[in-house]
């Protein structure tokens, strides 16, 4: 199976760690993508299409390819509408630290569920289909926890290291919220919370001023 992976070094490392030697893969950064790579691929995993919209046009060169696109900060329906794709297509959770897990977290359009099982069988991966919404499931919940942890520090209730330790010991989480934020990347956390706020209009996604301050300091 010829798999093309588009993303940065972290995405490549997570993909390789998850699938190991099960599948031969073409590992290209998003800046090296070209028509020949796309034409030769059976399956394309694009971790960065939302930040590189020009990719969407290139994929028309191979309408037979199965497109797997990182849709955490948007929806699959919105992407298909924008790019007019006719491929077999699925959205996946491609946030750093969330791809290399036992389950692929996927979204699909109406009528697309029938092919998901077949594709994941070829990939030799377990999967779960979630609703096609901004934030999917795991990213939405985790980023809300991170945001609330920043509010806790801002209010002076506890220090970061104490919150991380309490969450690990008290809830059996593998990492505390601040460690998770570093793994995911604060920019991703900020951008997802912002997208959730725009999508839902709900106050619970309001970004903590301390989180925003840290995010802006990194830019």
What are these regions (language model features)?
Residues 1-132, 160-219:
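NAD(P)-dependent Rossmann-like dehydrogenase/reductase catalytic/cofactor-binding core
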Residues 123-145, 149-152:
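Conserved anion/nucleotide-ligand pocket segment
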């Amino acid at each position: 199976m010829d798999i093309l992976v588009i993303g940065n070094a972290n995405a490549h490392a997570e993909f390789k760690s998850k699938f190991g030697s099960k599948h031969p893969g073409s590992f290209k950064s998003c800046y090296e993508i070209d028509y020949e790579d796309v034409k030769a691929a059976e399956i394309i995993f694009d971790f960065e299409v939302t930040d590189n919209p020009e990719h969407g046009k290139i994929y028309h060169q191979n309408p037979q390819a199965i497109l797997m696109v990182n849709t955490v900060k948007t929806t699959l329906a919105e992407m298909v509408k924008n790019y007019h794709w006719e491929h077999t297509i699925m959205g996946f959770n491609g946030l750093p630290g969330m791809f290399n897990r036992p389950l692929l977290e996927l979204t699909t359009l109406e009528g697309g569920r029938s092919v998901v099982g077949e594709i994941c069988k070829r990939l030799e991966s377990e999967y779960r289909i979630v609703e096609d919404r901004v934030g999917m499931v795991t990213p939405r919940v985790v980023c809300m926890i991170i945001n609330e942890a920043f509010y806790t520090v801002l209010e002076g209730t506890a220090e970061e290291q104490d919150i991380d330790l309490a969450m690990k010991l008290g809830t059996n989480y593998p990492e505390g919220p601040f460690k998770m934020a570093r793994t995911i990347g604060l920019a991703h956390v900020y951008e997802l919370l912002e997208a959730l706020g725009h999508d839902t209009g709900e106050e619970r996604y309001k970004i903590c001023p301390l989180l925003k301050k840290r995010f802006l300091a990194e830019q």
